[in-house]
């Protein structure tokens, strides 16, 4: 339609991950939509229309630097509210009916820029916990914990991971974990 933002087409990507000398290769289909407020309803419509199995919600450390910066948290709560209530902003009757049954198999909260908020920090405890499950207790996730609990109570499993896309830290491992956990 003229004057409306058109969603980008989904793209296919190959994910390679080596585990104990065994290389696993999976093909995934992904779409990246903008993070501005006026795109939020489009996120939800896109998830339902494409029947997305894994939702990866990417955050960074902005809310730790500036406590008044709550844009990420508002976007997160918007998505969580819709997933828990199954109330999606669909346009057609058919899509509204489809949305009542929609639920993702996995919700992944991924904290990006770990090279900035974790590895450059003076807190040696968290640097030691980089490759452990204890990193899930880091304060970067604190504002998002109530929403993750709501998802869990609604029957939507979720995981928390830390990556640095710029440096390539744990990106493949995180995608592989998502693919493994959704089963």
Q: In which residue ranges do the predicted regions lie?
A:
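Short acidic, Gly/Ser-rich segments with clustered Asp/Glu that frequently serve as metal-coordination loops
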Residues: 33-40
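A short helix-to-beta-strand connector/capping loop
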Residues: 21-26, 153-159
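Extended hydrophobic secondary-structure segments that form protein cores and membrane-embedded regions
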Residues: 30-32, 106-112, 159-165
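Conserved C-terminal guanine-recognition region of P-loop GTPase G domains, centered on the G4
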Residues: 47-49, 54-153
């Amino acid at each position: 339609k003229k004057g409306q933002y058109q969603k980008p087409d989904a793209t296919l990507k190959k994910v390679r991950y080596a585990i104990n000398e065994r290389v696993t290769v999976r093909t995934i289909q992904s779409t990246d939509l903008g993070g501005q407020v006026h795109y939020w309803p489009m996120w939800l419509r896109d998830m339902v229309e494409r029947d997305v199995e894994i939702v990866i919600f990417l955050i960074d450390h902005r809310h730790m630097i500036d406590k008044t910066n709550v844009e990420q948290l508002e976007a997160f709560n918007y998505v969580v509210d819709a997933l828990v209530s199954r109330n999606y902003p669909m346009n057609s009757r058919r899509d509204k009916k489809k949305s009542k049954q929609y639920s993702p198999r996995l919700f992944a909260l991924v904290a990006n820029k770990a090279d900035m908020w974790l590895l450059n920090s003076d807190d040696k405890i968290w640097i030691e916990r980089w490759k452990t499950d204890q990193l899930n207790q880091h304060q970067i996730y604190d504002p998002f914990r109530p929403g993750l609990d709501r998802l869990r109570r609604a029957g939507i499993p979720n995981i928390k991971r830390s990556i640095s896309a710029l440096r390539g830290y744990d990106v493949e491992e995180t995608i592989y974990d998502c693919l493994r956990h959704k089963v």
